[in-house]
C-alpha cells in the first residue's frame, strides 16, 4: 500500500486510514515510520481540503465522526482497488507474492491457523501473512477491524459481505474421566441440570442448546448450573480437563486428541449437537490478487480436511 503515498492527497488518505484502524496517532506514526507531528499535520490538511471533520480527538481519545466512518469505508475500497490494479499491472504472470491479513478466533489461531500459514509461506516464500486473533463475530463490511480474510462462525449479519461456506463445526458434549468418576455418568440431557457446566459465550455458541436423538429433541434450559462462562475456549477446556465441569459445545477437532488419550469422554454420545456454520468472509472488490485467491483456497482445504474423530465423520 505504501506505493500510494507518493501522491500527497493519497498519502493523507492513507494516513487517515491507518489512524482510523489503530485508533491512536502515535501507533499510526510508528507503523508508517513517520513522526506524530507529520500524522497530525496530514490529518489537518486532509480535513481542511475537504472541509469536513473526520476525527474527534484530544490528548487521550480519538474517534471517527459519522463522516469519518463513511470516508474510511469508501477510501478503504478505493485504495484497495488501486493497489490491486498496481499489483495486476506489475504481476502479469500472476506470481503468488505479497501480504495478506487473516483473522480467526484465538483457538483456531493457536492450534490450526499458525501451522497452516507456516506451511503456506514455506511453499510461497515471497508472501507474508498477518495472523490476527479476534474473538468477536459481529463483523460488518464497514467494521474498521475487518481484515482481508476473516474466519467466522455463526451467521452472516451483513448482506454486503462476500463469503464462502466451508465445513461446519461439529460440536460434542464432554467431561473428563475424573469428573465422571466423581459425579457419575449422565443418561439423559435433563440430568445436566444437576451437574456443573462450564459455559461459552461470544463464539456463536451461546444461547439455548437443543440436542437431537432421531425424532426426539431436548432443549437445555437456563436452569443448568453455570458458575463460569468465558469467551476463551481454551480457558474452558482447561477447566474441563481438570475435572471442574462439563462443556456442552466443545469443537470436535479440538477434542480429538484428548479423547484419543482418554483425557476426555463424550457425554450423551447418542444425542447430536447441531453443527455450527463456518464461513470465510471478505469484502467485495473488483480484483482479487493471485495471493488472495490461492490463500483462500488453501485455508478452505485445510479447514475442510482438519483431523476429526472417526465416529463424527458422518456427514
Swiss-Prot record:
Keywords: DNA-binding, Transcription, Transcription regulation. It comes from the Bacteria. GO terms for molecular function: DNA-binding transcription factor activity; sequence-specific DNA binding. Gene3D superfamilies: 3.40.190.290, Winged helix-like DNA-binding domain superfamily/Winged helix DNA-binding domain. One of its GO terms (biological process) is DNA-templated transcription. Residues 25-44 bind DNA. Residues 8-65 form the HTH lysR-type domain. The keyword Ribosomal protein does not apply. SUPFAM superfamilies: Periplasmic binding protein-like II, Winged helix' DNA-binding domain. Belongs to the LysR transcriptional regulatory family. Probable regulatory protein. Its target is not known. PANTHER family: HTH-TYPE TRANSCRIPTIONAL REGULATOR (PTHR30537), HTH-TYPE TRANSCRIPTIONAL REGULATOR SINR-RELATED (PTHR30537:SF21). This is Probable HTH-type transcriptional regulator SinR.
Amino acid at each position: 500500500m505504501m506505493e500510494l503515498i507518493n501522491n500527497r492527497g493519497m498519502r493523507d488518505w492513507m494516513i487517515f486510514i491507518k489512524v482510523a484502524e489503530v485508533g491512536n496517532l502515535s501507533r499510526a506514526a510508528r507503523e508508517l515510520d513517520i513522526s506524530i507531528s507529520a500524522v497530525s499535520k496530514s490529518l489537518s490538511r486532509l480535513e481542511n481540503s475537504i472541509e469536513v471533520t473526520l476525527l474527534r480527538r484530544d490528548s487521550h481519545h480519538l474517534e471517527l465522526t459519522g463522516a469519518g466512518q463513511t470516508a474510511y469505508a469508501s477510501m478503504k475500497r478505493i485504495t484497495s482497488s488501486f493497489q490491486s490494479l498496481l499489483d495486476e499491472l506489475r504481476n502479469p504472470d500472476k506470481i503468488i507474492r505479497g501480504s495478506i491479513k487473516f483473522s480467526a478466533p484465538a483457538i483456531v489461531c493457536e492450534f490450526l491457523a499458525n501451522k497452516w500459514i507456516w506451511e503456506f509461506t514455506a511453499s510461497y516464500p515471497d508472501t507474508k501473512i498477518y495472523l490476527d486473533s479476534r474473538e468477536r463475530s459481529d463483523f460488518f463490511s464497514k467494521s474498521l477491524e475487518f481484515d482481508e480474510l476473516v474466519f467466522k462462525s455463526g451467521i452472516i449479519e451483513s448482506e454486503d459481505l462476500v463469503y464462502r461456506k466451508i465445513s461446519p463445526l461439529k460440536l460434542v458434549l464432554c467431561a473428563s474421566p475424573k469428573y465422571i468418576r466423581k459425579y457419575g455418568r449422565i443418561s439423559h440431557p435433563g440430568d445436566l441440570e444437576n451437574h456443573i457446566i462450564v459455559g461459552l459465550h461470544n463464539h456463536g455458541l451461546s444461547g439455548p442448546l437443543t440436542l437431537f436423538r432421531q425424532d426426539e429433541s431436548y432443549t437445555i434450559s437456563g436452569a443448568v448450573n453455570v458458575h463460569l462462562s468465558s469467551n476463551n475456549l481454551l480457558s474452558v477446556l482447561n477447566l474441563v480437563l481438570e475435572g471442574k465441569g462439563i462443556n456442552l459445545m466443545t469443537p470436535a477437532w479440538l477434542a480429538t486428541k484428548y479423547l484419543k488419550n482418554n483425557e476426555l469422554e463424550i457425554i450423551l454420545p447418542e444425542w447430536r449437537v447441531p453443527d455450527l456454520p463456518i464461513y470465510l468472509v471478505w469484502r467485495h472488490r473488483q480484483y482479487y490478487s493471485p495471493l488472495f485467491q490461492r490463500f483462500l483456497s488453501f485455508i478452505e482445504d485445510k479447514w475442510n480436511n482438519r483431523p476429526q474423530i472417526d465416529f463424527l465423520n458422518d456427514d
